[in-house]
C-alpha cells in the first residue's frame, strides 16, 4: 500500500497532452502540427468540457445545479442526446443474459445477443442468438481482414490472471458483458462496419461454427490488396497530419496508462481502509456493553462507522466496475488506431516505391502503370477512412469521458453526503446526553 496520497502524473515526454494539437484540427497538414495552432477543445478535456458545460461560478457548483444534493442531474443531461439518436437508428443490438456452460473438456460463458432492425439486409425484424467470447474474437478478426482501412473497436482482454480474478464470478461476467455490449454498439453505430456481411452473419446465424468451418472469404478487393502488403517497403516520411495523430495516440495512451495504475492503487488502499473500518466500528459496540450513560452514544458511533464503510464499498465498486473498464477500453482503442495507422504507412511506402521505380525508367514521359494507380487509390482510401474514423473516435471519446467524469463526480458527491449524514445523525444524541447532565 502506498504510504501517502498519489503523486501527480509524471511527465511522459516533452509534450503534454493538452499542448498537443488536435490531429484533425487544421485544414492543412502544416496547421495540424504547427506550434502556433490552438489546441482543440477535445484535447483540453483536462481543463474543461466547453464554456457551457462545466462553468464553476462562486463555490465550484456546476452551473444549473442548486447544490451538491442535486448531483444526479449531472447525468440526466446526458440522456437527451441518446434519445434523439435512437429515433434515427435502424439497427439495435443488446448483449445480456450470460449463462455458464459446463462441458467435459471446458467451461465457458455465453451471452444472448438480441438484434432488431428495419434494414433490408435482414430477413427478419428480430433475431436472438447466443455467442461466447471466442465468437466475438472471430468477428473482430474478420472485420480487420475485410475492412483494413477502418478502425475496429477493441475487445476486452481475453486472458485473466488465475487465482487473482475469477472469470466465472458474477462481477467479472457482468463487467465483460458490458464491454461486449459496448463493442457491438460501436460496430452498430459505424456507417461501414455495420453493413459488413460477417457482422450480419454474427448477429443472425444460429450455428456460427458452421460458417467458421467453411472458412468463408468475404474479403473486399481493398482487403485483399492490403493483406498482401508484406511490409517490405520502408516509409520515408509520414505526412504531418498523420504524424500528429501518431504522436497524439502515443501521449494519450501513456496518460491513460498512468491514470489506470494510480486508480488501481487508490482502489487497493480504499479496500484496505474498508477492512480497517469494518474492524473499527464493532469495537465501539462491544465497548458500549461496559458503559452505562455512554452506551447509547457509543452504539451511535458504531452505526455511523458502519454506514460510512457501506458508502465506501459502493464507491470502490463503482470505480472498479465503471471507471477502470473505460480507461482500459481506450488504451486498447489507441493500440487499434496505431495498427490502422501502420497499415496506412505500408500502403504509402509501397506507392512511393513503385512511383520511384517508374520515375527511374529511361523514358521521356514514362506511363504510370495501372498497379501504381491502384496503389494510389488504396492510399487515398486509407487516408479518407482513417480521418473519418479518427474524427468519429474523438467524438465518442469526448462523450464517453464526459459521462465518465461526471459520473465519477456524482458518485463521490453521494459518498461524502452519506458520510456527512451519518456523522450528523449522532450529534443530537450527544447533545441530549450533555443537556441531561
UniProtKB/Swiss-Prot annotation:
Topology of the protein relative to the lipid bilayer: Peripheral membrane protein
GO biological process, one term: positive regulation of autophagosome assembly
Comp. bias intervals (Low complexity): 63-73
Record domain PX: where: 89-210
GO molecular function annotation: phosphatidylinositol binding
Keywords on record: Endosome, Membrane, Phosphoprotein, Protein transport, Transport
InterPro entries, per database record: AH/BAR_dom_sf (IPR027267), BAR_dom (IPR004148), PX_dom (IPR001683), PX_dom_sf (IPR036871), SNX30_BAR (IPR028649)
PROSITE patterns found in the cross-reference section: PX
Protein name per Swiss-Prot or TrEMBL: Sorting nexin-30
Lineage: Eukaryota, Metazoa, Chordata, Craniata, Vertebrata
